[in-house]
Regions:
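N-terminal Rossmann-like or analogous alpha/beta NTP/dinucleotide-binding catalytic cores
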Residues: 1-80, 171-173
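Active-site cores that bind ATP or allylic diphosphates and position pyrophosphate for catalysis
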Residues: 68-173
C-alpha cells in the first residue's frame, strides 16, 4: 500500500501552518514517508461542488435551518452519547423554508440518510452494522457559511485518491 498525506484543512480558522509542520515532523520522527501528497482539502472546492451538485440533482440533500443550540435542545444527549439529528427540517415545505430565509437564517445542507441497516467488515473492529438514520441522522454536506463539510470532502477525496483503507477511531465508523 501507499501512504497518502492529506491535510484536512476545510476549517480555515482552526487549520494553522504550525499544525501542518507538526504533522510532517511527526512523520519524520516515526521514520515514515508518504508516497503521495501532501494534498490540501482547501484546494479541492471544485471537486466538492461537483459531488454536491450530483447529490442535489438526485434530491438527496435538503436545507436545514437548525442552529447548534436548536440541535442540542432537540436531542439533549446525555454525557457520552452523540448528537443525532432528529430530521426537523427534512420535510419543510417551500413556504416554511422561505419564511426561515426571510427571517435571515441561511441554511446548511444535509444528506438524507436511508432508514436501513448498513453492514461491513472493519479490519480492526470486525463486523459492524449501523442504521444511519437512527444512529447518526442526516448529516451536513455544506455548512450555512457555504463551506463544504468534512463528511462530504473526505469521501470525495478518498474516492479520487484511491484510498481504500483508513485508520480512524471507532467514533468515526
Amino acid at each position: 500500500g501507499e501512504i497518502v498525506l492529506r491535510i484536512e484543512d476545510l476549517d480555515r480558522e482552526r487549520s494553522k501552518s504550525e499544525y501542518i509542520d507538526a504533522v510532517q515532523r511527526d512523520f519524520e520522527m516515526l521514520g515514515l514517508t508518504w508516497d503521495r501528497g501532501p494534498f490540501f482539502q482547501h484546494d479541492r472546492d471544485e471537486a466538492y461542488a461537483a459531488a454536491f451538485d450530483f447529490l442535489k440533482e438526485r434530491g438527496l440533500i435538503y436545507p436545514c435551518y437548525c442552529t447548534r443550540a436548536d440541535l442540542h435542545a432537540a436531542s439533549a444527549p446525555h454525557r457520552g452519547e452523540k448528537l443525532v439529528y432528529s430530521g426537523t427540517c427534512r420535510s419543510l415545505s417551500a413556504k416554511e423554508r422561505a419564511a426561515k430565509e426571510a427571517s435571515g437564517r441561511m441554511p446548511a445542507m444535509r444528506l438524507r440518510t436511508p432508514d436501513e441497516v448498513i453492514s461491513f467488515h472493519d479490519t480492526i473492529q470486525g463486523d459492524y452494522s449501523q442504521n444511519l438514520e437512527r444512529d447518526c441522522g442526516d448529516f451536513l454536506v455544506r455548512r450555512s457559511d457555504q463551506a463544504f463539510a468534512y463528511q462530504l470532502a473526505v469521501v470525495v477525496d478518498d474516492a479520487a485518491q484511491g484510498v481504500n483503507s483508513v485508520v480512524r477511531g471507532v467514533d468515526l465508523l
